Swiss-Prot record:
InterPro entries: CbiD, CbiD_sf
Protein name: Cobalt-precorrin-5B C(1)-methyltransferase
Tagged with keyword DNA damage: no
Enzyme category, top tier: transferase
Record has Glycosyltransferase as a keyword: no
GO biological process: anaerobic cobalamin biosynthetic process; methylation
Pathway named in the protein's UniProt entry: Cofactor biosynthesis; adenosylcobalamin biosynthesis; cob(II)yrinate a,c-diamide from sirohydrochlorin (anaerobic route): step 6/10
Record field: catalytic activity: Co-precorrin-5B + S-adenosyl-L-methionine = Co-precorrin-6A + S-adenosyl-L-homocysteine
């Protein structure tokens, strides 16, 4: 029986709870052990206050980040908020919160990386406990953030010096496909501010194989070929170079745009269909159908098909992708093998 995965809370929810608790204690002679906050999705949650420090005119509270069963590098770190009496209402960042240095994010260059939804959450919840006629300055900080950020996408996104305060729902969905798609979309958005051409790869094999990263932004799309192409269209990318290992690319040749094996795994069938057009005998085709890997298939057909087989396969993949995006952008394709290296591509070498 499959274990039900546990949800967690975003850095945005933790920052909001810490800020609300600190503000409440700044104006009330009471120590809180926990505090309730409303989430953007209409739910109310209660988070424990892990740390409290009271000084004249300010209170600091800390909330421990619980990512649930999601493999989040910020799990267990403490998100702090300092509330100070002020002449105006202000939310800012401090130690361990990253600073934006590149365009393409929903924040201005120079801003602390407290995203719009968490910022709105903090403001809304703090004002619920803020006495009428009073104002407060909220500083969000996380001393561990400057170290943990190195294990996140922040350096690549141009967010330096710390983590981001994130979250659109307030909760972390464990191992979420949607969270990964949001990352892909964000990377493509960032890339679009630098270039109207990008290279899409499935993972580390593609990263290590291609030399295009020296010529244009490179985005890792995982198995989400279709989503990445749609995102590229949305962000007005003009040309996509799709580079992938034959095991993934053969699926795209069959019109499969989510290459997760549990979604669709017809590698052998698609290979067999294309090879049958080249007149291979039934015995070879049967071996192809029962092969364990695409690399094994390449060994089976070595010397039986020419370079033109892979060139035509690459053109077919290009055609499938162009049809998928309805011509909104140009697609070029390169196929490689882990054992045999470059197999085919649809573009001429760069000058």
């Amino acid at each position: 029986m499959k274990k039900e995965l546990r949800y967690g809370y975003t850095t945005g929810s933790c920052a909001t709870a810490a800020a609300k608790a600190a503000t409440y204690m700044l104006f009330n002679d009471e120590i809180l052990k926990s505090i309730k906050i409303d989430l953007p999705i209409g739910k109310e949650i209660e988070l424990d206050i892990f740390y409290i420090e009271r000084k004249e005119g300010e209170v600091i509270c800390g909330v421990r980040k619980d990512a649930g069963d999601d493999p989040d590098v910020t799990h267990n770190m403490i998100i702090y908020a300092k509330a100070e009496k002020s002449k105006e209402f202000l939310i800012t960042g401090g130690e361990g919160i990253g600073v934006v240095t590149k365009k393409g994010l929903p924040l201005q260059v120079g801003d602390y990386a407290i995203n719009p939804v968490p910022r709105k959450m903090i403001e809304s919840e703090v004002k619920k406990v803020l006495p009428e006629g009073k104002n407060v300055k909220i500083t969000i900080f996380a001393p561990e953030g400057k170290y943990i950020a190195k294990r996140t996408l922040n350096p690549k996104l141009g967010i330096i010096g710390g983590i981001s305060i994130l979250g659109t729902t307030g909760i972390v969905e464990p191992l979420s496909d949607e969270a990964y798609k949001k990352t892909i979309d964000l990377e493509i958005s960032m890339a679009s501010s630098e270039s109207n051409e990008i290279c899409l790869v499935f993972g580390n094999y593609g990263k290590n194989f291609t030399t295009l990263s020296s010529k244009m932004p490179l985005v890792t799309m995982g198995n989400y070929v279709g989503f990445a192409l749609e995102s590229a269209c949305k962000h007005r990318i003009k040309k996509v170079y799709l580079v992938g290992q034959i095991g993934k690319m053969i699926k795209v040749a069959g019109g499969i745009f989510n290459t997760y094996s549990y979604i669709a795994d017809a590698r052998n069938e698609i290979f067999t269909a294309y090879l049958s057009l080249y007149g291979l005998d039934r015995g070879i085709l049967e071996k192809v159908m029962s092969a364990n890997t695409t690399e094994e298939i390449l060994d089976l057909i070595e010397g039986k098909v020419g370079k033109d087989f892979f060139e035509n396969l690459a053109l077919r993949i290009k055609e499938k992708c162009t049809q998928y995006v309805k011509g909104c952008l140009e697609v070029e394709v390169e196929i490689f093998s882990l054992k045999k290296g470059h197999l085919a591509k649809t573009w001429s070498d760069f000058k």
